[in-house]
Amino acid sequence: MTTVFQTMPTFLAGLNIANFGAATSQFPKLESEITAPRQSMSTAFQKMPTFTSVISVPSIAAIAPQMPSVKPEKGVIGQCLICGEPSTGKHYGIVACLGCKTFFRRAVVQRQDTECKREKPCDVTTMARKACRACRYRKCLESGMSKEALQPRRDLIGCRRIRSRPSCSTSTPTPPRPQVEDKSQYLTLLENLTTIDDRLRKKKLEVVASRQAAVDLAVLAKQGCMSITDTSGPSTSRYVPGGTSPNGGDHKMMVMLGTDISVSTQSELLMMLEWTRTLPVFASLPVQDRSVILKRFAVHCLILEHGYYTAQANIDDVWLITNGTCMPRNVEKLEEGCKISVSADRRWRQEKLYKQMTDCCIDEVATPLRNLKLSPQEIVVIKIIVLFNCGCSSDYSEITEASRRIVLTFRNKVVSALFAYYESVGLQNYAERFGNLVLMLSGVSSAASSMLEAYQVMRLFKITPFDPLSQELLFNI
């Protein structure tokens, strides 16, 4: 302790503090008192000089002039003439607060309703100004706010900087818009695809009609009726030529049997294979990728072809296949001649096994297609979209990345060709129509799942004798 107080004068000398002599003269006396007994310790501290006597602290008055002056806040210039809240300026011609200024601008720009629902004028004060927008807007006008003071071109979300465009002499040429040659190429591509699809569809219907005629001849041969006039009747009773609605009175709707499903499925899938070979990019894909795409597209192809055929036939509450037979939504609502030909076993299967598939196909596919009235160009584009969407998703590792890029590029090209076709025929709101086509694809997928499940039941219980090609494409067997 003695050493500490001995060194303190030296420390204070470096500080150059006033009254240093008076402070240091008392340190020897303090040293003797500190060495006294502990009972005199309190006396020693009482005799120590105070801090203010050792160090002189400048007064606050001396410091105050050196502090920077703070400007007072800008005062209000008056109360808002509308609600009475303090205001700091004039807005749209009168003294108004920021709240009433913003309200008036939004009411004018957005053309909000200005009709009061009460009989008496509402109170427009600071606490109740939001109760009635009509009365508040009316008071704004009565107080002197002017609509002409608004800047109508001001953006609601703030000012936008308009970048100055360089002069034509120094600017680089902008990318040209698609030329007429590109549009003509798109139209030519779509025309070729549509022609091939129509030709194969007609060929398929002719094959189905020939097969059905052969079956009818075989039935008549068993019955001993070989006249040509008699053979024409049964053929027209099951086949609807060209997919149009039958107008003849001799037409009789028939419920499809297992053999009808088998023959129709085989014909559809054979035409599908022939159709895909005509696509420009499909032949360039690896065999494994083509196999995956075809297996996933097979049931969707049946849905699209049968749905397009049903929509053209214009018959309600039935699902038709290409040989003219149908799956009815309700067997009891069929004509008497058709209802009598349905066996009890077939009626039970229709109500218990095929009911869900029939309803889904009619509601999700046939009815939307009939309402949209698809053109031949649209149906071929829809088929290509579904074909290249089956198997080319990133979820399926079987498809190589190179094949996925190829098919997606071609799919986008076909969609652009459809847009060019819409423009060429002068269709209004074709973007909306294409959106409706795309929205329909979810129903196609749902109906495809229901059909595949029903066909699995038919195969499992040997109701329908599917050929090896159909089993490989549909069931991957």
Curated annotation (Swiss-Prot):
- Cellular component terms per the entry's GO annotation: nucleus
Keywords from UniProt, A to Z, are: DNA-binding, Metal-binding, Nucleus, Receptor, Transcription, Transcription regulation, Zinc, Zinc-finger
Pfam family membership, one:
Hormone_recep
GO MF terms, alphabetically ordered: DNA-binding transcription factor activity; RNA polymerase II cis-regulatory region sequence-specific DNA binding; zinc ion binding
Indicate the segments forming the NR LBD domain, all copies. 216-477
Where exactly are the zinc fingers annotated as NR C4-type?
80-100, 116-140
The record places the DNA-binding region at: 77-152
Query: What InterPro entries does the record tag this protein with?
Result: HNF4-like_DBD (IPR049636), NHR-like_dom_sf (IPR035500), Nucl_hrmn_rcpt_lig-bd (IPR000536), Nuclear_hrmn_rcpt (IPR001723), Znf_hrmn_rcpt (IPR001628), Znf_NHR/GATA (IPR013088)
Q: List the disulfide bonds.
A: none
Q: Does the keyword Phosphoprotein apply?
A: no
Q: Which family does it belong to?
A: Belongs to the nuclear hormone receptor family.
Q: What does this protein do?
A: Orphan nuclear receptor.
Which named protein is this? Nuclear hormone receptor family member nhr-19
Origin organism is Caenorhabditis elegans
Q: Which gene encodes it?
A: nhr-19
